[in-house]
Amino acid sequence: MKPSLICGCPKFDESVPVERLNGRKISNNYASFVTLTDGYIKDAMCGYRIYPVEPFYKICRFSYIDSHMGFDTEILIRMIWKNVPIIYMPVEVSYPVGGKSNFRMIRDNIRISFMFARMTIGMWLRYPILNKRRKSQKSEKDKNKTDE
């Protein structure tokens, strides 16, 4: 069995700030774009994860990885590029009234934007492989639909 990334999939209650939901949607869409995986990424920013040791070690050893708010998203993208399977687990999330966030609006958005710029370049360098994988997965899904 191939090692998998266990990734939290947040189930937000009504306390979640709208700007956080919108930011997550943008990140999820962009992460899906740079991995060519339409709808596969449930939540790119959730830090509730269990990483498979060998792929994680190789990624960290041979790649520059953002060390702040972009870390979780970048690792997820790189794991998908390496074709590491992802298992999503639901995680209940609520935001306490008056809770403190470690997110710094300007600084962290700039860092995340630069991370996505690097990931876009990485996607284009890997495009032939990612596109072939995407087409293969799409044809497999189509085949499964016709078998039903």
Locate the predicted segments by residue:
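Hydrophobic helical membrane-anchoring modules
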Residues: D38, F62-E148
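Acceptor/aglycone-binding surface of glycosyltransferases and processive sugar-polymer synthases
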Residues: M1-M69, P96-F103, R107-S113
